[in-house]
Swiss-Prot record:
Pathway membership, UniProt: Amino-sugar metabolism; N-acetylneuraminate degradation; D-fructose 6-phosphate from N-acetylneuraminate: step 3/5
Homology family: Belongs to the NanE family.
Alphabetical keyword list: Carbohydrate metabolism, Isomerase
Function field: Converts N-acetylmannosamine-6-phosphate (ManNAc-6-P) to N-acetylglucosamine-6-phosphate (GlcNAc-6-P).
Source organism: Mycoplasma mycoides subsp. mycoides SC (strain CCUG 32753 / NCTC 10114 / PG1)
This protein's name: Putative N-acetylmannosamine-6-phosphate 2-epimerase
Enzyme superclass (EC): isomerase
């Protein structure tokens, strides 16, 4: 069974920390990921070279890897250039996730970046982090292996929107036009939501904040106790 089939109907856990987040420490994240795998996590979504290296020392599950890197001339920061792709290939991550929005990139445009990746690394699986339908259609046409909704709510035109609103209407609309496997990421806080999304025919789901970002989990509880 290939990896894409293997992750169908799977709970993918995102365990990341950057900048001044309190858990931004490779040792801490490696222990968290070890605990996640003990709990049954089958696939992890991870960022940053030093973190991925350390985590790979203690777990042996498929990894969706990305590098968050900010450049002065672009809003794109998830694996924005071929340099970050090269680093992730060196780490031997199973799937590389990159921003697939139509926004201006710091180096090559998305079309040429994908051509470069497919020439250098023809067997590398790629996940498109999208924000809207147009991103997803373009990513599918460019040959991405997986289409993810990671960036919905994080771009100017999708601000204040998410994957859950209006009874998952965005995911339903996406399913009508995308034939590649769709990965739902963002805004999923309960197992019930996860089940309902998978029942739409979505390939698999990514949950991060609701499981691995302690400050947001506490905030969620406090907000719901009011």
């Amino acid at each position: 069974m290939n990896l894409i089939d293997q992750i169908k109907n799977t709970l993918i856990i995102s365990c990341q920390a950057v900048d001044d987040e309190p858990l931004n420490d490779s040792y801490v994240l490696s222990k968290m990921c070890y605990a996640l795998v003990l709990g049954g996590a089958k696939v992890l979504r991870l960022s940053q070279v030093e973190h991925i290296k350390k985590i790979k020392e203690v777990v042996n599950v498929p990894i969706i890897g990305l590098i968050k890197k900010h450049y002065d001339n672009s809003e794109v920061f998830i694996t924005p250039t071929i340099k970050e792709v090269d680093q992730l290939v060196d780490l031997k991550v199973d799937i590389i996730a990159l921003d697939a929005t139509l926004r201006k990139r710091p180096d090559q445009d998305l079309t040429n970046l994908i051509k470069t990746i497919k020439t250098k690394y023809p067997n590398q699986l790629l996940m498109a982090d999208c924000s809207n339908i147009n991103d997803a259609i373009n990513a599918q046409n460019l040959g991405f292996d997986l289409i993810s909704t990671t960036l919905r709510g994080y771009t100017k035109d999708t601000l204040n929107h998410n994957n859950i609103e209006n009874d998952y209407q965005f995911l339903k609309d996406l399913k009508k036009v995308i034939t590649k496997p769709i990965i739902a990421e963002g805004g999923i806080w309960t197992p019930q939501q996860a089940k309902e999304i998978l029942n739409l025919g979505i390939h698999s789901i990514v949950v991060g904040s609701a499981i691995t970002r302690l400050h947001l989990i506490v905030k969620y509880w406090n907000d719901n106790l009011k």
